Amino acid sequence: GYNSAKVQLDKEIKKNKGKHKLAIALDLDETVLDNSPYQGYASIHNKSFPEGWHEWVQAAKAKPVYGAKEFLKYADKKGVDIYYISDRDKEKDLKATQKNLKQQGIPQAKKSHILLKGKDDKSKESRRQIVQKDHKLVMLFGDNLLDFTDPKEATAESREALIEKHKKEFGKKKIIF
């Protein structure tokens, strides 16, 4: 995913010709940060999500997903703003999330670039719109359809319709893991 994303990002930068401030937005869990140690622990101890999740996040021990750190450093070097949009709890998890990202050398891990789920957030769309206020959002990264767009209703049919609608963007503007 990240290797092809680098090629796509270069295309977007070239196409932009310096006209707009460019940004990319990434989900955190299983896209930037690897939580397989938590998943393994939960499996061995017969726990189901979200049991133990908050404690895992607070431990700030997740390592980057393979290729994420290198790609993000590349995007940073190219002058692209990086935003992390996650459904982690804004009140409980912001400090630990920022600490984890910084410890792993993930660029632009400042609070203004880590957009976690607040009490009133129903979806990630409102946080994507925050980025789009003063940026051209050229790429989205995630491991779930909801990291890219929000279905009007949570049915298999509405998800299939969204996939059909956006299928030409997958692998280009929308990188799915």
Model-derived features: positions:
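C-terminal cap/substrate-recognition subdomain and adjoining C-terminal extension
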Residues: D89-F177
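Non-catalytic pre-domain segments flanking phosphatase-related domains
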Residues: G1-L26
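Active-site flanking residues adjacent to catalytic metal/cofactor-binding acidic residues
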Residues: L26-L28, G142
